[in-house]
Amino acid sequence: ALNAETDNNLKLIVNPPLRSDIDRQALLQAFSDGTVDVISTDHAPHTLEDKQNGAPGFSGLETSFAVAHTELVETGVISIHRLSALMSANPAKILGLDNKDSFQGARGKLEEGFLANLVLIDLTEEWTVDSSKFKTKGKICPFENMEVVGKVLATWFKGEKATPELCDRVRK
């Protein structure tokens, strides 16, 4: 498990910092009892040089679902429905984006009038985290070589399947 006692590597400096295994167990309990409302990532894709200079964070976008699914759903801590809420519906609700009057368009539900921001996931695909295959600039990942279950196969943003061209347009 990733915690402060086992990982003193400069590349793994994060905010908030890694905690003890006791804290990690308490966090699992908080997922289980409903205390935790959201799972998200700030996706801080730093280069190796950035990390060597002490930049906190690491790439999380390409592993967040699979790691959460493996560590929380596959182990029975929470259901897949709860994970979906933690990563989609709950953040939208907390940010006020879950209604059709939202100035940015409604999100977080599969309903008419809501933006079609979706992912297609194979919940059974087993794979090994290999940061060299990440599309992001940051190849630093504490989950390197971790065996995970659950693979995001495709993403749609506002109803359009995500492609490199769409990503370039969104960034502008």
Question: Whereabouts are the PLM-identified features?
Answer:
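Short glycine/proline- and charge-enriched loop/turn segments
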Residues: 5-13, 49-52, 135-139
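Short C-terminal domain-edge/linker segments immediately following a structured domain
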Residues: 20-29, 69-74, 148-155
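A generic local structural motif
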Residues: 23-27, 105-108, 141
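Histidine/acidic residue-rich metal-binding segments in metalloenzymes
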Residues: 1-39
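A short acidic, glycine-rich active-site loop
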Residues: 12-22, 59, 141-147
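His/Asp/Glu-enriched, well-ordered alpha-helical/loop segment
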Residues: 11, 32-33, 37-39, 44-119
